[in-house]
């Protein structure tokens, strides 16, 4: 039994990028789809689509990589360098608008679940709302 499906999704994405997979499948939910929508809009993934695998709904996440590097390691640059769950089932983390962290001085994003929906840190600051700090990505 999974106790934290969001952490499972982030781990699947992290593991797939480390071995340069083109895509990975995660069990579908509306909340996960909202997180993936933000990751796609911010340029961390190519996109995603709903698929059925053995009659069960999944989200197929298409991962994104940068150009191939020069030198002895010709693998492409990873777009997602770090993806980490912050608020967990055992320790929820809520922040007000003034406590929303700036991830890597604005180069990364924090994803929050707010009363206005699932938002990035910049959107939440702009709207003046706080919420549950789901994860950070850079």
Curated annotation (Swiss-Prot):
Keyword Protein biosynthesis applies: no
For this UniProt record, give its keywords in alphabetical order, as a comma-separated list: Ribonucleoprotein, Ribosomal protein, RNA-binding, rRNA-binding
Q: Could you tell me which Pfam families the record lists for this protein?
A: Ribosomal_S8
- Provide any one GO MF term from the record: structural constituent of ribosome
Any one cellular-component term (Gene Ontology): ribonucleoprotein complex
A Gene Ontology BP annotation from the UniProt entry? translation
On whether Ribosomal protein is a keyword of this UniProt record, the answer is yes
- What HAMAP family does this protein's entry cite? Ribosomal_uS8_B
Job description of the protein = One of the primary rRNA binding proteins, it binds directly to 16S rRNA where it helps nucleate assembly of the platform of the 30S subunit central domain. The combined cluster of proteins S8, S12 and S17 appears to hold together the shoulder and platform of the 30S subunit.
Which NCBIfam families does the record associate with it? PRK00136.1
Q: Which family does it belong to?
A: Belongs to the universal ribosomal protein uS8 family.
Q: How does it assemble?
A: Part of the 30S ribosomal subunit. Contacts proteins S2, S5 and S12.
Q: What is this protein called?
A: Small ribosomal subunit protein uS8
Instruction: Tell me the organism's taxonomic lineage.
Output: Bacteria, Thermotogati, Deinococcota, Deinococci, Thermales
Encoded by which gene? rpsH
